[in-house]
Amino acid sequence: MTRPVRLDFPIQQPGWYTKFNSPYYTQSHVEYRAKVRAFVEKEIMPHTHEWDEKKSLPLELYRKTYEAGILPGVVGSPWAGGMGAQLDVKGPKDFDYFHELIILDEFGRCGSGGVLWGLLEGVHIGLPPVLNFGSEDLRRRCGLRVLRGEATICLCITEPYAGSDVANIRCTAKKSPCGQFYVVDGEKKWITNGVWADYFTVAVRTGGAGMGGISLLLIEKTMPGVQCRRMDCMGVWASGTSFITFDNVKVPVGNLIGAENNGFKYIMHNFNHERWGFVVQANRFARVCYEEAFKYAHRRRTFGKRLVEHPVIRAKLADMVRQIDATHHQMENITYQMCTMPKEQSAKALAGITALAKVQSTKVFEYCAREAAQIFGGASYVRGGQGEKVERLYRDVRAYAIPGGSEEIMMDLGVRQAMKEWDAVQSRM
């Protein structure tokens, strides 16, 4: 297996990129990684700072990313929700979750959660419910356009008064007297890509209180009563994060995703994939912080010697490395289980460990962003210049620690899953 990739120093890249053997990757992964890396270095990295400052991306970038055989790869394995041949989307025929890991990891090298989310996150979290649970009509009408970069999509779960507490969403969808429409009223908040999305995968209340009364609807931006406004957030500036209002929006009943009042199950199914994506991204961002700090520590001189010659700086770098590499191995193990477990089994078995991995990766990201900023000093407090990536990523940290389930909720979920398994074992004894 050939693995040609430039390496300036250890841990700059995952071990399998260079000299270490791995049981997870094939020649297909190596070739795909090279392809994705070339695209990122040509089309993304030279423009990252500009797009982040503008808080938007050129919409033609979606089409470019599809033409490169990359965009459909973020919706999960098998390729395009198992519809690759039918939808005729571009990409490896042997696509698996390690190919998707490569996409998210390589795009993370740009050092901007906003740019990565602005291009990939809406597709990554908003389209899988349509592909996995939607009708054939929705898959073709919406799914194909999004996969080909002709339209954009976002996931609308969070509300002003319901974030991690999904079971208590207030946005309602009531059947019209004629029975042909759902009439949707409510608000959604912190919606990634909402500013420019053409489609919205929306959690609505179609039944009674609690998780049993939730459904998913596909709402289109052109439907009267849909209003979006950009939110001015701490980080991920180019992500198009928005506040969305649905005011008496008439949605055809054919836009129901899956079965009525089954939406909570679909949302939970989607969360594993979303949280795993956060793990991949956050760990690469931690690696970017380490890479930037390592290089700077070799250039910067204080008290007559390079920063890296001070033991306290080397200790910081060592702490960063050990946490990044350990998290990467945990991430690869989960990815392997995603590739080999039946979907029904993995949905339950991986929920707890993926939640804990999200906590691990976001804490490592936060640690590395802080330590890199300490090594850069004042240079990390300025937008642009030598500390550009570190300054930007420090602002992005909270966007990974909170969405998709806060650290506290994720830790509790991990332990509760373990308790369920314990109770199941005890009941058989």
PLM-predicted stretches and their roles:
Residues 1-110, 120, 133-138, 145, ...:
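Alpha-helical interface subdomain recognition
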Residues 149-158:
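A short, Trp-centered hydrophobic/proline-enriched beta-strand micro-motif
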Residues 162, 189-195, 235, 273-277, ...:
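Glycine-rich phosphate/pyrophosphate-binding beta-alpha loops
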Residues 171-175:
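A structural signal for short hydrophobic beta-strand segments in well-ordered beta-sheet cores
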Residues 248-266:
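Long, acidic (Asp/Glu-rich), low-complexity accessory segments flanking structured domains
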